[in-house]
Amino acid sequence: MKKTPRKVYVVDNGFVTSKAFSLSDNLGRLLENQVFIELVRRGYDVERTMFYYRSRNDKEVDFVLRKGVHIERLVQVCYDMSNPKTEKREVDSIVECAGELKCNNLVIVTNNDKRTIEKDGYQIDVVPISEF
């Protein structure tokens, strides 16, 4: 695995919004932070079981969840995938990382989208944050 820069998360989205200049520009980042908080609540640990990954072609996945030595799940976060270019970028990223990491349990967390996407033999569950 290639070493990547660490991402920084805060435990309270209220802190982020109080310091943000434009809330609309940060909705995706706030959603990603909310997913991070939920994963920590579920027991994932940033030092042992929860990672960020960048592929050989610079595609990224927000969360790689590990159980023991096995990759359990890949989680991508995207506030709004209504733009076809955005959807393509997010789907291509998670599929490429899934291939490199040999993981079939893929999810994209969104603000309110719910569906299943199939690409290159992978099934990706798209779920709203309220159901994550």
Predicted region positions:
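Short, glycine/serine-rich, charged loops/turns that create anion-binding
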Residues: 15, 57, 79-82, 113
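Arginine/glycine-rich "motif VI" loop of SF2 helicases in the C-terminal RecA-like domain
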Residues: 41-45, 93-103
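Domain-level recognition of nuclease-like catalytic cores that cleave nucleotide substrates
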Residues: 111-132
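Active-site-adjacent loop/helix micro-motif of nuclease/hydrolase catalytic cores
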Residues: 82-92
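Active-site ExK catalytic segment of metal-dependent nucleases
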Residues: 71-83
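Accessory nucleic acid-recognition modules appended to NTPase machines
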Residues: 1-71
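Short, hydrophobic beta-strand segments that form beta-sheet elements in well-ordered domains
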Residues: 104-110
